[in-house]
Amino acid sequence: FKASEALILTNGVFSELPEPSIRRFCVDQLQEHCMRVGTLARAICNGLHLPEDQLDVASMAGILHDAGKMILISSFPDEYWRSILESRSRYFPVFGAERQALQASHAELGGYLLDLWGLPSPIIEAVTYHHEPWLCSQSVFSVTDAVYIASLIDHERQSNLADGWSEPINIEYLQSLGVADQMDSWLRLHKATLAE
C-alpha cells in the first residue's frame, strides 16, 4: 500500500460528497490538511531515523488520518456541525464532542473504515489513536505519535473555518517518549512543508 493509493482513496471519498457539504465543511482545506500531515509525519519519522517502511506508513496514515470525518460529513452532517460548534464554544477537543454526540469520534470511525478496507494495522492504529496516542500499548516513539504531532502542529498553524477547537500538544507525553526537545525542529519542518 503506497502513499499514491492513499491519495486515490481519499480523493475518491472526498469526491462523493455533495457540493453543499464540501463548502460547509471546507473539504478542500481538510484535504490540504491531510496532505500536510502526511508530509510532516513522514519528515518527523525520518528525523528520528525510523526505518524506511515506517516512513511510508507515516505518509499514508497522515493522509488518511481524518477519513472518519468523511463518514460524519456524509452521514451525520448536522450532528458533526453541532460537535464542531460545541468544541469551539467550550474549548473542548472536537473528537470529544463527537463522542458525546455520536458515541464515536472521527478517529475511531476512520480506523474502523480503514479496517474494513483491509489496510495494514499500523495505519489503522495511527488513524484510530491520532488524538490519543498514549492509549496505544507502545512505549517508544511510533508512527501514531508522528501523526498526532503533525496533525496538532498543522491545526495550530493552519486552522480552517470548519475546524473545532484543538487541544495543545501533550508535552508531558512527548517527554515520556524522550522527544519533547524536538518540537522546535518539527515546527521548522512544518514551515518547510508549507513552502512546498
Name each model-derived stretch.
Residues 1-115, 121, 125-128, 136-146, ...:
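Acidic/His-rich, divalent-metal-binding segments that scaffold phosphate/diphosphate chemistry
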Residues 171-196:
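Terminal helices and disordered tails flanking the catalytic cores of nucleotide-processing hydrolases
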Residues 55-56, 140-142, 170, 176-180:
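Short hydrophobic "helix-edge" motifs at membrane interfaces and signal-peptide entry regions
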